[in-house]
Amino acid sequence: MNIQIVEGDILDQEVEVIVNSWNRNIIPWWLLLPQGVSGAIKKNGGTAPFKEVAKFGAIPLGEARLTSAGKLPYQNIIHVAGINMFWFASEYSVKHSVLNAMRIVEEQQFSSVAFPLIGSGSGNRGKQWALKIMKSTFSGIMSDAEVLVVEYAK
């Protein structure tokens, strides 16, 4: 697997699919004020992806769900339940978010995917903490997909 760590905006990456670090989908999407990647998706891509992910109901911690990309230029968005209902990321939630997002990448045969640093923003963990867990998890995955891990930079 080809993994690159880049600085920038996940919405500027030329990939087939992006990953959105979402919550467990317990609170209705329209009651939330999305921040970070979710906020950028809503602002630039509209509400369609969030309406779609709401139809799945509660998402188990670390699981992933596939939706359209709304008005964004991607084939799809993979939403991962990277934080618990107390808005906190754990090693389990980050590891399983990566594993389950990559499972969807493989099932859908996407050739490229961009991940944010899961758990580093709304998950109240630092960038280095998230990156360490993500790199360790990727090391155990076999895939032909190009993977970008995007560290947000303005």
Name what the model sees in each region:
Residues 9-12, 69-72, 139-142:
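Solvent-exposed alpha-helices and their adjacent loops that cap or buttress functional pockets
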Residues 72-85:
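Short, basic/glycine-rich phosphate-binding loops at helix/coil junctions
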Residues 19, 78, 115:
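Conserved, mostly hydrophobic/aromatic
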Residues 1-5:
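Extreme N-terminal starter segment of soluble prokaryotic enzymes
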Residues 16, 75, 111:
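Conserved acidic residues
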Residues 10-56:
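Short, conserved "active-site rim" segments that organize catalytic pockets and cofactor/ligand binding
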Residues 49-74:
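N-terminal short beta-loop-beta anion/metal-coordinating cradle
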Residues 82-154:
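Phosphate/ribose-phosphate-bearing ligand recognition and processing surfaces
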